[in-house]
Amino acid sequence: MNNIVIVGLQWGDEGKGKIVDYLSENADVVVRFQGGNNAGHTIVVDDEVYKLNLLPSAVLRPGKISIIGNGVALDSHALISEIESLKVKGVDVNYNNLMVSESCPLILSVHKDKEKLFEDLNGNHKIGTTNKGIGPCYEDKVGRRAIRLCDLENADELNKRLDTLLNYHNAIRKGLNYQVVKKEEILKEIQEISEKILSYKKPVWKILNDLMKEGKKIIFEGAQGAFLDIDHGTYPFVTSSNTVASQAITGSGLSSNAYIIGVVKAYTTRVGNGPFPTEQKNEVGDSLFTIGKELGTVSNRRRRCGWFDAVLVRQAVQLSGVSSIVLTKLDVLNSFDTIKICTGYKYSGKMYDYLPASHSIQGELEPIYEEFPGWKENTQGKRSIETLPINLIKYIEGLEKLIGVPIHLISTSPKREDVIKLKDF
């Protein structure tokens, strides 16, 4: 099991960062393969809280290699700022333990401008983006006009590519009576950061293939969650990249078999707009929000909260070929008398055992629940299966039966050490 892919199976915020950090103790390399600094991974080490956006979670472990793959939309200024903030805390990030793909498309100020502009134009139909410029950056990548990290080394090439990029963006800005951008402004923006960021530039695909031949253990760290996937998520309320496990190949350049682990919360949360069948707009939702401290790591927005959706997670398991589940934030459910799990949907007299693709149907689905008795016992910080209440064990067994794959690990607090291994991988 030299290669592991770790992905979220809900709408993100499942606790992937902690799990990657935990498993990376026995790995050599951790790779980010999609998304951008719209992702937020929170890790607690010795009571110190680290909030990572672009950097792989292994950056907190000495001796590990962290890699940002070509599938990541790269905000160079944000990355350098994140590196410098970690150095202040004593974390060593250097050109030997962090490598960035030379093919990464760069997020520029024009991308952030465009995202905000179109979100404002959408009015009441906003997607609810983080306004980090990720979507417009991916649009330019697909449109073959993106500035990539490798372009910064060649002034002539950079100038040509900037002309192409700004012809497109300024045409849109003129049409919307928005001030055009001068090339000199973008050049200055790039030149401010180019020397620092180019120091990390590497042919990541080649390095990963060489590391694999050496027998190194590699973890691929997903961002967001399965139902934010541009193809398989609750479209159009999705992110702009593929978040399922298969993207690990495309977004890194390493084609190899891997063991796939899915991370889920013991309940469900979602940031921003979009369908959410098990959302609880009541005391249950308020309790989950308060106890779970459900504020977005990046956006600081309140996360919507609801019961665990086994239909959704089972579908995500199948989309990513998941072999194993890690269950997080079980301790948030400690005080509940009764806990519900969604086992199916009802819409217009028809039963569904999957999430239909139609947005109009998704928003009208009526969840069907199975109830489980709560355990009414403090489980926060538990580290052995023998200390767990019987009703919590029954809840886990119920989830396994509904999802169709085993739960191997559970997390009982944000701290690195508070993990219980239920079964061997």
From Swiss-Prot:
Record's cofactor remark: Binds 1 Mg(2+) ion per subunit.
Keyword tags: Cytoplasm, GTP-binding, Ligase, Magnesium, Metal-binding, Nucleotide-binding, Purine biosynthesis
Gene3D superfamilies according to UniProt: Adenylosuccinate Synthetase, subunit A, domain 1, Adenylosuccinate Synthetase, subunit A, domain 2, Adenylosuccinate Synthetase, subunit A, domain 3
Subcellular location: Cytoplasm
Catalysed reactions, semicolon-separated: IMP + L-aspartate + GTP = N(6)-(1,2-dicarboxyethyl)-AMP + GDP + phosphate + 2 H(+)
Active-site residues from the entry: 13 (proton acceptor), 41 (proton donor)
GO molecular function, a single term: magnesium ion binding
Pathway involvement of the protein, from the record: Purine metabolism; AMP biosynthesis via de novo pathway; AMP from IMP: step 1/2
GO CC terms, sorted: cytoplasm
Cofactor(s) needed: Mg(2+)
Nucleus is among the record's keywords: no
Coiled-coil boundaries: none
EC primary class: ligase
PANTHER family reported in the protein's UniProt record: ADENYLOSUCCINATE SYNTHETASE
Subunit structure and binding partners: Homodimer.
Protein's name in the database: Adenylosuccinate synthetase
Species annotation: Wolbachia sp. subsp. Drosophila simulans (strain wRi)
Gene coding for it: purA
